Amino acid sequence: MLFPTEFDVIVVGGGHAGTEAALASARMGAKTLLLTHNIETLGQMSCNPSIGGIGKGHLVKEVDALGGAMAAATDESGIQFRILNSSKGPAVRATRAQADRILYKAAIRHRLENQPNLWLFQQAVDDLMVEGDRVVGAVTQIGIRFRARAVVLTAGTFLDGKIHVGLNNYTGGRAGDPAAVSLSSRLKELKLPQGRLKTGTPPRIDGRTIDFSKLDEQPGDLDPIPVFSFLGRADQHPQQLPCWVTHTNERTHDIIRGGLDRSPMYTGVIEGVGPRYCPSIEDKIHRFASKESHQIFLEPEGLTTHEFYPNGISTSLPFDVQLELVHSMRGLENAHILRPGYAIEYDYFDPRALKASLETKAINGLFFAGQINGTTGYEEAAAQGLLAGLNAGRYVQEKDAWCPRRDQAYLGVLVDDLVTRGVAEPYRMFTSRAEYRLSLREDNADMRLTEIGRELGLVDDARWDAFSRKRDAVSRETERLKSTWVTPKTLPVEEATALLGKAIDHEYSLAELLRRPGVSYDGVCGLKGGECGPAEPLADDPVLLEQIKEQVEIGIKYQGYIERQASEIERNDANENTRLPDGIDYREVRGLSFEVSQKLNEFRPETIGQASRISGVTPAAISLLMVHLKRRGLGRRNGTAAEAAEQGDGAVPTQQ
């Protein structure tokens, strides 16, 4: 067999965005090439050894519902699992896992090496091949030219990356890896709008030099141990380990303040903006000067290493200051640092220059995903990667792009925020960013997206069969609870009092009882000596059984709220998905201010919904725009219901 140099899709970069992009494109049936500077670092967790969290866990569940790899890889490598906000409402509950770095990489690589239609090749990319307004391939550092109809660029922090430790700095994509300087220069030649951002990582500590007797232990959830994937099982997890907690103190803060004159952040050496919600320890001490202590989590890096990740002290201070501040904390008085912390500056490109499909507006067939779009976090990268890979595959197949809506997925919220609002700092997902978060829960990500994923070609038979069984079981059990009744005569007073606090005074369905505060699904099913439970088990697998029960309980308890949110979505839908013509000149829209028309002409929103979320575009301006479209007969809805069903709900035409 000759060495292949022609592909449908090329993915550049093998991080969390690149691996999901390559897998998605290949699952679509596109002949896909993944180019990485080092095959050994495929799926590498460059910073913290954890997956998930508030908002982030929602994205991981959505990637999983669409057939992605991150959740399943976490189940196979997770050494601690926790449900965050477990005492709060279902909208904000989130799964978080500590992962063994080596096992996680192995799980991702196994999937890549066994994915049909996917080729791997180790070479850094120095150039993109562009003909006119189209990308046609990529050129590696030794001059190999690979041609393709679509390219997905997932360069992470590698584009002209510069690493800072104190006032020393050097080029690098991350510690131990070279920066992509030539590729960065080439992208700048293409006149794509770009800027600089910054992120950082803490020093790593040898666990053998930590005095754990002085620390507070933080175990994971053990009964039961959570799973991330909808197909996951708790017996997939390796050995579980605790995390540990220490704190900074006034001496720590004094040490940090004393080192600020050699901090690249506070001496103007670093120009890029860092992440607001994952600040360096220098920023914490400066911004929260009155706070006497900050909590620091010591997280194990894996089962076969003594290395610990001190979550909360990301820093670019000089190494001697890092050593002193670590030794100032309880339990770390004699700690040995294995790797220094550092900050890294890198190029990103203004995501407002992207379509909602993550294809660049300027160059057809070129897609961006991950930190190149101004986001931070493994989960945000993976979600974008899956979407970009999917749409690159659909692009070469001459099919319409799939662009999830804000009311459909956190992925839709993420992309819409990026392409309409841009970023002034690294973007991180939170549940607070989603206006329809009661409908966008972790637990129902498969109910929202797996059917769409099946239509798009992302979901295999095994996942589809498991989902279908779950969906049907939830539907049957919900209907059973609605149609099963108890009366004062059939429900013993003592049972009613134990469950409800008092006897019932008239006939109730089991669903009506379940809606009451403090009443659980198991409590209702246990009435009348268990006679109110299902005649047959809902599922044999205990994880699936809990998922079904959770879906049934939430669906019934929150039915009224969910229906009201659905009505709100329907009211907003008319304008949200009205498409804007590609060639419209907003200066011709009567009544629009110069500022608004200038912004609309600059950012070229694809829909009325996107236009309404651009900073400075007022509701009055949207009304004028709607009148203009109606007068000219230009506005059109985003496809019929039948088309949406055929394309996967939320499809928009690809401009080719």
Swiss-Prot record:
Subunit: Homodimer. Heterotetramer of two MnmE and two MnmG subunits.
Subcellular location, record wording: Cytoplasm
Annotated positions binding FAD: G13, G14, G15, H16, A17, G18
Listed Gene3D superfamilies: FAD/NAD(P)-binding domain, GidA associated domain, C-terminal subdomain, tRNA uridine 5-carboxymethylaminomethyl modification enzyme MnmG/GidA
Name of the molecule in the record: tRNA uridine 5-carboxymethylaminomethyl modification enzyme MnmG
Pfam families according to UniProt: GIDA (PF01134), GIDA_C_1st (PF21680), SAM_GIDA_C (PF13932)
GO biological processes: tRNA methylation; tRNA wobble uridine modification
Taxonomic superkingdom: Bacteria
Claim: Iron is one of the keywords in the record: no
Function per UniProt: NAD-binding protein involved in the addition of a carboxymethylaminomethyl (cmnm) group at the wobble position (U34) of certain tRNAs, forming tRNA-cmnm(5)s(2)U34.
A GO molecular-function descriptor: flavin adenine dinucleotide binding
CC annotations in GO: cytosol
InterPro entries attached to this UniProt entry: FAD/NAD-bd_sf, GIDA_C_N, MnmG, MnmG-rel, MnmG-rel_CS, MnmG_C, MnmG_C_subdom, MnmG_C_subdom_sf
PANTHER family in UniProt: GLUCOSE INHIBITED DIVISION PROTEIN A, PROTEIN MTO1 HOMOLOG, MITOCHONDRIAL
Needed cofactors: FAD
Family: Belongs to the MnmG family.
Alphabetical UniProt keywords: Cytoplasm, FAD, Flavoprotein, NAD, tRNA processing
Main location group: cytoplasm
Binding annotation for NAD(+): 274-288
Key word Hydrolase present: no
The organism of origin for this protein: Burkholderia cenocepacia (strain HI2424)
